[in-house]
Amino acid sequence: MALKHFNPTSPGQRGLVLIDRSELHKGRPEKKLVEGLTKSGGRGGNGRIAVRFRGGGAKRLYRLVDFKRRKQGVATVVRLEYDPNRTAFIALIKYQADGELAYILAPQRLKAGDEVVTADKVDVKPGNTSPLRTMPIGTIIHNVELKPAKGGQIARSAGAYAQLVGRDAGYAQIRLNSGELRMVLDTCLATVGAVSNPDHSNQNLGKAGRVRHMGRRPHVRGVAMNPVDHPHGGGEGRTSGGRNPVTPAGKPTKGAKTRVNKATDKFIIRSRHKAKKGR
């Protein structure tokens, strides 16, 4: 979908660039496929801040999106919808066999009236789902499973995709947007195509109020705080922080490695960090 550029008739309109969502459904979501969503304000189970600068925002209903796509058969796309809980658009589909409704991630070039298929072998058309072992090498995919039957975990945000680049000894090799090359079992499911709304990153919300509506609060710099609040805080007058950049907990930021799951290192053929250095 295209971008909408606004004329500078007010400070909040100046520079405003939004996604044109005129082709999406304008009514309420499917009632059977939504749940209430309680705001956390960025707090964890113990009531303490887990994620800084979160709170407020418009009320939302959580759409129950089917990331597993285990139901075999043909379904027809009823409509495309906006989902406030994710950057991508979602599609309401209706299975032809029994009339069951479900939400799925909408890939690019999918429109109302199209058919999507889940089967062991499918045509290479956006929205079709099959195991990686039956897909042609080079296929652009999204919503890729890391473990069979767990549901898609890779390439789910707006405009994201991965590419199937090879198969070997029961594993499929996929290249991610980050440059990482990794293996997953070839029995894992993936969906053909790239995720919808690729222009999401080109939006300019124009004013702070629109960001607040999304539940995000002002992001305060550590050097603007007091020493009790941040390792960079305090000092007479403006300071540079006086040390290498750290988090509020004092851990190095700006590129320090945080990955600790050595058990799955064997599935990563080429790290995303090495991929960046090689460019």
Curated annotation (Swiss-Prot):
Natural source organism: Caulobacter sp. (strain K31)
Disordered: annotated segments: 222-264
One Pfam family per UniProt: Ribosomal_L2_C
BP GO terms, sorted: cytoplasmic translation
One term of GO molecular function: rRNA binding
Keyword rRNA-binding: yes
Family from the record: Belongs to the universal ribosomal protein uL2 family.
Quaternary state and interactors: Part of the 50S ribosomal subunit. Forms a bridge to the 30S subunit in the 70S ribosome.
The protein, known as: Large ribosomal subunit protein uL2
Cellular component, GO, one term: large ribosomal subunit
Residues forming coiled coils: none
Function: One of the primary rRNA binding proteins. Required for association of the 30S and 50S subunits to form the 70S ribosome, for tRNA binding and peptide bond formation. It has been suggested to have peptidyltransferase activity; this is somewhat controversial. Makes several contacts with the 16S rRNA in the 70S ribosome.
Organism superkingdom: Bacteria
Keyword Nuclease: no
Signal peptide: none
InterPro entries for this protein: NA-bd_OB-fold, Rib_uL2_dom2, Ribosomal_uL2, Ribosomal_uL2_bac/org-type, Ribosomal_uL2_C, Ribosomal_uL2_CS, Ribosomal_uL2_dom3, Ribosomal_uL2_RNA-bd_dom
Keywords recorded for this protein, A-Z: Ribonucleoprotein, Ribosomal protein, RNA-binding, rRNA-binding
